[in-house]
């Protein structure tokens, strides 16, 4: 990735100006986009999207479990999110005897809905710009404290936008009595698993259904049998009319992280160092876990959520690198920066300062990422930390220990430790005297790992109960890792570019860009705050001679169905429904066939955190549940290209079809108004 005169000539006109469907917009400022939205098929007003004076669509959107989105679809707090967003909760409720991951779960009444310990959802009350309050000397902590005192269950955050050029206060109501209502079998909800993840065409019924409960005053409350279904200010009406190519779509959700304004230095680090290293490390971890899961149903359940979490980013990073290379993102950044230099010679020092700051911090940030991908993944050391946590009572400590061992296998952890200690030893860019001494004492990283697991007495709950944690070899290891962690966590920021030494130059740089590039539509990077994105249903040209249509159907599921492959072994009930064409009201005529729609794609700008987001038509009605992007679209966190980037949506008609024909839970339809 070297700068060349040829590239500068070819790309001198390159800009990162607004493309038709690019952007993740703050809903409180959506009035600036309404004219464009209406020209593309939106029928409502800005007040319908976001209002603090009346119920609006924002009141039906939830931040689910701290990292996903969900949508409320009834007057009784029923909400839909992705299966992969509810996966941890479903897995925690599952046992070998009651395997809800494999078999699914469907409550047939409110009484059968299962409490999900620790699961929380947040509903936005309002957002306020507080840039001036901070400039006047008020602290973030003071602003948050005042906001949280306003109501029962209020939680607040102050988030920076445009690298600190603006700041907003977000006030939420936090609900922590959330119960599982329904989840399809994994071979529907995760159909295709890692093989199909980030891939189009897609046939995954990636949804799960929960319900929010509140106290008698409709306020957030801890779990109680006396709690009642929450009555939201607004819920989404469901449309079963379907979609066609060109239809308007809108996403309302909590995108987690984008890097729209990073420079070529950061793109080079991501594509050539960070992503390739993390991909290789996670490949090792997935191979170890996958081999163990094949040998034992118990291990498969224990490590199901862990495996899914590791695999998701692993495949995403692969697509990100491919997309960056395919679009020439690095070269475009170089050319854009050169245009900025030429147009703003008095501000060219900002790019020089950014480049110097990157050079100062790249090794430290790489070490943080290496620690996160290697040492952090060795689980047994957590027992040491729990045992030493003085904030816990004896009862709380034992409960935490029991929860840890519930989903732990010491033989799997041993293999992971061997692989990750060797990898850390190979790639480390910082000194680690304590760990290096342990390696040297036992004859190397692998030898030390084997010695550690041969001699620890913490390998199982039963062994733990009679062990002395303070003198156990795992404690010695945990202390050695803590030395590394203290250094690594100095660089624990969302992205490399958010390290203060780098970010301090981004604030004036982005401000200068906004003053200079008047053709570019600027929006704040995603940071897990509520955003609106809009686009249209559209296929795309995947490769030369290969056009991907925007809709998939049940026929694609049957073509992939394979009883010999776990991830494609669909429930027999679905085979039976297909064989008899017992589709009920969910059957449609499409391209001359009687079928059931499954998924579709659109041009909405999305990222992680948008999983589970409501996908709405021009009337603000729910037409699908967002759950993924196409593989090459994963680079849209850095560069969005409308010709290539597509988000993947589970058609709401397939959700309802599965609820009805597979789950037999049609009792939910009345409250959803279907």
Regions found by a protein language model. Give the residues of each.
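Terminal presequence/propeptide segments associated with secretion/organelle targeting
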Residues: 2, 16-674
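Sec-dependent N-terminal signal peptides
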Residues: 4-13
């Amino acid at each position: 990735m070297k700068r060349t005169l040829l590239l500068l000539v070819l790309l001198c006109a390159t800009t990162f100006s607004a493309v038709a469907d690019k952007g993740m917009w703050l809903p409180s400022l959506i009035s600036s986009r309404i004219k464009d939205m209406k020209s593309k098929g939106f029928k409502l007003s800005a007040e319908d999207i976001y209002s603090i004076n009346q119920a609006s669509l924002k009141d039906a959107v939830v931040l689910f479990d701290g990292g996903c989105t969900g949508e409320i679809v009834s007057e009784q707090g029923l909400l839909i999110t992705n299966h992969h967003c509810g996966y941890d909760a479903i897995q925690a409720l599952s046992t070998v005897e009651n395997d809800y991951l494999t078999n699914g779960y469907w409550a047939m009444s409110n009484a059968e809905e299962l409490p999900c310990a620790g699961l929380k959802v947040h509903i936005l009350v309002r957002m306020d710009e507080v840039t001036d309050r901070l400039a006047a000397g008020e602290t973030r902590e003071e602003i948050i404290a005042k906001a949280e005192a306003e109501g029962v269950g209020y939680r607040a955050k102050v988030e920076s936008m445009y690298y600190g050029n603006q700041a907003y206060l977000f006030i939420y109501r936090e609900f922590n009595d959330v119960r599982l209502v329904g989840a399809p079998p994994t071979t529907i909800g995760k159909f295709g698993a890692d093989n199909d993840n980030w891939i189009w065409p897609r046939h995954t019924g990636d949804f799960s259904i929960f319900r929010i409960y509140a106290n008698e005053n409709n306020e957030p409350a801890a779990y109680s049998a006396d709690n009642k279904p929450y009555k939201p200010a607004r819920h989404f009406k469901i449309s079963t009319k379907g979609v066609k190519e060109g239809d308007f779509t809108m996403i309302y959700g909590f995108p987690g992280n984008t890097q729209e304004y990073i420079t070529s230095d950061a793109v080079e680090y991501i594509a050539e160092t960070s992503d390739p290293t993390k991909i290789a490390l996670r490949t090792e971890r997935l191979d170890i876990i996958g081999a163990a899961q094949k040998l034992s149903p118990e291990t498969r359940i224990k490590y199901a959520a862990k495996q899914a979490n590791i695999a998701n980013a692993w495949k995403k990073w692969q697509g990100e690198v491919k997309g960056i290379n395919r679009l020439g993102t690095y070269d475009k950044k170089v050319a854009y920066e050169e245009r900025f230099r030429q147009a703003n010679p008095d501000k060219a020092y900002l790019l020089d300062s950014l480049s110097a700051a990157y050079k100062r911090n790249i090794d430290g940030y790489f070490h943080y990422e290496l620690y996160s991908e290697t040492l952090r993944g060795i689980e047994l050391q957590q027992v040491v930390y729990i045992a030493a946590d003085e904030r816990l009572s004896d009862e709380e400590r034992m409960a935490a220990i029991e929860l840890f061992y519930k989903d732990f296998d010491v033989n799997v952890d041993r293999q992971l430790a061997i692989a990750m200690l060797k990898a850390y030893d190979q790639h480390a860019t910082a000194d680690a005297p304590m760990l290096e001494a342990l390696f040297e004492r036992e004859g190397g990283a692998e030898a030390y790992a084997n010695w550690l697991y041969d001699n620890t007495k913490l390998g199982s709950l039963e062994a733990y109960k009679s062990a002395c944690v303070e003198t156990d070899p795992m404690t010695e290891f945990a202390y050695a890792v803590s030395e590394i962690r203290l250094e690594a966590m100095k660089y624990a920021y969302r992205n490399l570019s958010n390290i203060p030494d780098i970010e301090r130059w981004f604030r004036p740089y982005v401000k200068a860009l906004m003053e200079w590039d008047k053709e570019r539509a600027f929006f704040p990077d995603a940071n897990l705050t509520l955003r609106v994105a809009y686009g249209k249903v559209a296929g795309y040209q995947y490769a030369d001679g290969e056009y991907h249509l925007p809709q998939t159907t049940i026929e694609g599921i049957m073509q992939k169905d394979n009883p010999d492959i776990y991830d494609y072994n669909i429930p027999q009930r679905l085979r039976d429904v297909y064989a008899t064409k017992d589709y009920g009201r969910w059957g449609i005529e499409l391209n001359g066939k009687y079928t059931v729609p499954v998924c579709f794609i659109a041009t909405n700008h999305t990222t992680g955190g948008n999983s589970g987001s409501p996908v709405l038509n021009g009337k603000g009605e729910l037409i699908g549940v967002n759950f993924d992007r196409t593989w090459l679209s994963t680079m849209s966190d850095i560069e969005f290209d409308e010709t290539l980037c597509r988000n993947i949506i589970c058609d709401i008609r397939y959700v309802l079809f599965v609820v009805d024909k597979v789950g037999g839970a049609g009792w939910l339809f009345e409250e959803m108004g279907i």
